[in-house]
Structures are given as structure tokens and as C-alpha cells.
């Protein structure tokens, strides 16, 4: 059944107009963007198929290639291009917010950006957000990549990068592809080692985030682990 044949109160667009976007499911929001379905499937059905293909995770969907998106029945290259453009605009909007001087007074913005960057990665990635003395972003840099379960991080190389960017502070982050955001003993020990090494060159570690799946990134600072 086409969405136009649904009761008005159940149609995604009408629900958004009445209750706002936060009231809609991921599939309903995608359906509004897709606009129309295909023979035998409404736009909501098509959106559900799309989410199912990418494990129900918007982060994984956002990282999919054009070819991967277009391979879903009913999507095609035109809709795939529209989706990629939408995800890229979201990334750019967050990046622009990150470049403003008050970016790092809002942990929520940092979390959102890190989730976009790291949540769907299939292997561990360790990155640093280098900041100046006013906590304005100098550079977001992926320093090390590893396997599904671990990555090797070398404090000496992190210190070299800090000096190269003339950084005054840093926010560290890495992902757990397992989907579990809890820090391991190795994570805690590494954080202490990096904090001590960077302190030797007057670079302050403001936080260390672990990004895992759709859960909010875990903050070492909030856990009292810094």
C-alpha cells in the first residue's frame, strides 16, 4: 500500500509536521527523504530494507559507498547519490561547528562528530583532535589504525604530532568495533601514558572518548579516569 493510502495521522511527513522530526523513527525519516517507494513497497518499506542491509545502524549507512547503497533493491544510483549528499552535508555542518571557538565547551557536539567519524569503522582507529590555547580545533588527525580488536599506539609519535601542530591541548578518541564502549585496562594505562608524555611538552589531555556503535561515546573525564 502506498503511503498516500495510509491514514493521514500515520504518514511520516504529516507526523513530522504535527510532532516534529524527533517523534519519527529512522525508517520514517529516511522514507521522507526517499519520497517514493517501488512497486509493491512503500517508501517506509524501502527505508526499512535499506537500514536492514546496513545492520540497522545509521553510522554504517552513512559510511556506505555509492555502489553499496545502489545495490539495495529499489534504491539505484540516483537515490544513492541523494543519500550520500545528505550525509556529507551533515558531516560538513558538524565540521563547521567544530571549527568555532565555543565548540569544545559542548561535549555533545564533540560526541556527535566522533560518532560520525568512528562509529561504523570496521577496525580500531586512534585519533587526536589538536587544539590551540583557546580550545579551537587545529587539526583532526587519525594517527593509528589497527585490527578489529586492537591498535598499537606509540606515545612518542603522538608527542611528535602535538609538536608539529603546535598544540596546547588534545582530545583523544578511538573506537571499539565490538560495540562495547567500556574501557579496558590497556585503554586506561595508555591514557595515563599519553597524558604523562604530553605533559612533558605542555600539552593538556582534555578527554579521551571511546566510540562504539550507536551508544553515546564514553568520556574518560566524566568517568574520572584522567
Swiss-Prot record:
Q: Some GO term, biological process aspect, for this entry: which one? A: proteolysis
Concerning PROSITE patterns, the annotation shows: MPN, UPF0758
- Motif (JAMM motif) positions are 174-187
**Domain MPN, which positions?**
103-226
Q: In which residues is Zn(2+) bound?
A: 174, 176, 187
**Record Pfam families:** RadC (PF04002), UPF0758_N (PF20582)
Arranged from A to Z, the UniProt key words for this protein are: Hydrolase, Metal-binding, Metalloprotease, Protease, Zinc
Example GO molecular function term? metal ion binding
The entry sums up its family as follows: Belongs to the UPF0758 family.
- Its protein name is UPF0758 protein Daro_3142
